[in-house]
């Protein structure tokens, strides 16, 4: 029972209690760049979840055989291999989205969330809990991406997943798209508002005054 509770906590805790973007402020670069559309935010979420979960699993699997002096290099090699797989799959089956995501798929290699979980958790834990931890942190990352992407696409273009939701003036409706929401600064402010909202709801996440 306790094991099941721990696995459940590993999946759910990174969403609000220990969100990698909102609390740890990691992975912000891609969060600013790929959230103009829900479609790209969703695909990026799946990509990061895939890489984080499997890199955690493989690092944990061989953790006792990795010399301490080269552990970061080994982790990077595993992560890079998985990112190449993701990149090739996207180019083969989702080429348009792959072009929109551009270099940010490759930059998953240097994503602090992926590297951080491999070093802090997978190197000290069994493979299955490490895999679940990767899924959880991918969900936490995706929660922020999808929330930001929802508001940016809805207010920036009046659409969700490319489908018109708010009747646009150009089509005889009433909504004038807000172009500012499609620029990177809007994502920065939205993430800031999310951090404020989460820390208002969970005051224990506020840093203690020095």
UniProtKB/Swiss-Prot annotation:
Q: List the disulfide bonds.
A: none
This chain belongs to the protein called Na(+)-translocating NADH-quinone reductase subunit D
Record key words, sorted: Cell inner membrane, Cell membrane, Ion transport, Membrane, NAD, Sodium, Sodium transport, Translocase, Transmembrane, Transmembrane helix, Transport, Ubiquinone
GO BP: sodium ion transport
What organism does this protein naturally occur in?
Answer: Vibrio cholerae serotype O1 (strain ATCC 39541 / Classical Ogawa 395 / O395)
Q: How does it sit in the membrane?
A: Multi-pass membrane protein
Classify the source by domain of life: Bacteria
Provide the function of this protein: NQR complex catalyzes the reduction of ubiquinone-1 to ubiquinol by two successive reactions, coupled with the transport of Na(+) ions from the cytoplasm to the periplasm. NqrA to NqrE are probably involved in the second step, the conversion of ubisemiquinone to ubiquinol.
